[in-house]
């Protein structure tokens, strides 16, 4: 089982787009990727999730992020299900789906709950260095909110690029709105620098350990 901060395991997978090597397939293009598992093809909640992801695909791609699905179904089941979605819902699924029919990758990533034979609704966000940045699990009975995952990706990218943290419900936080949090000072000198920056109007603070600013 892997955890946040670890390198995503190198593995070759069979998908609806052919054999893909992870994480290289995406990282060599300088892209992040979202690997998400679903319990089974031809099930109602999973169908709504794939429809929702496809509808937001361009938003993810504008951020340099590619989705890739996974379940323990065989590839022909994925293909038939994608055809059903296109014929009945009018949406063509453009991203690949992994056919992990032996459950080997799912087991390695901890996607299969104890005592189960199918995957939970797991989400792994992996950056362009192949590092796992976030892991989210939903139970089989509750579908994912792709808008929240999109928010999470945006926040992770901003944090990575600017060395800041993002508050609850960013960019609509009740205390600081769309501003970002400056990491707390860890030395006396840094504390002094925060206080000086506040006095100059460069940042805002509730206290020296809780400072924030508007991104330029």
Swiss-Prot record:
Gene Ontology CC entries for this record: cytosol
Catalytic activity: a hydroperoxide + [thioredoxin]-dithiol = an alcohol + [thioredoxin]-disulfide + H2O
Biological processes annotated in GO: cell redox homeostasis; cellular response to stress; hydrogen peroxide catabolic process; response to oxidative stress
Presence of keyword Cytoplasm: yes
Keywords for the protein's UniProt record, in alphabetical order: Antioxidant, Cytoplasm, Disulfide bond, Oxidoreductase, Peroxidase, Redox-active center
Binding site for substrate: 121
Domain Thioredoxin: 2-158
Disulfide bonds: 205-211
Subcellular location: Cytoplasm
InterPro entries: AhpC/TSA, Peroxiredoxin, Peroxiredoxin_AhpC-typ, Peroxiredoxin_C, Peroxiredoxin_TDXH, PRX_1cys, Thioredoxin-like_sf, Thioredoxin_domain
EC number: 1.11.1.24
Pfam families (alphabetical): 1-cysPrx_C, AhpC-TSA
A GO MF term: thioredoxin peroxidase activity
Residue numbers annotated as active site: 46
UniProt record similarity statement: Belongs to the peroxiredoxin family. Prx6 subfamily.
Note, other: The active site is a conserved redox-active cysteine residue, the peroxidatic cysteine (C(P)), which makes the nucleophilic attack on the peroxide substrate. The peroxide oxidizes the C(P)-SH to cysteine sulfenic acid (C(P)-SOH), which then reacts with another cysteine residue, the resolving cysteine (C(R)), to form a disulfide bridge. The disulfide is subsequently reduced by an appropriate electron donor to complete the catalytic cycle.
NCBIfam families the record matches: PRK13189.1
Function in brief: Thiol-specific peroxidase that catalyzes the reduction of hydrogen peroxide and organic hydroperoxides to water and alcohols, respectively. Plays a role in cell protection against oxidative stress by detoxifying peroxides.
SUBUNIT field: Homodecamer. Pentamer of dimers that assemble into a ring structure.
Protein name in the entry: Peroxiredoxin
Organism: Pyrococcus abyssi (strain GE5 / Orsay)
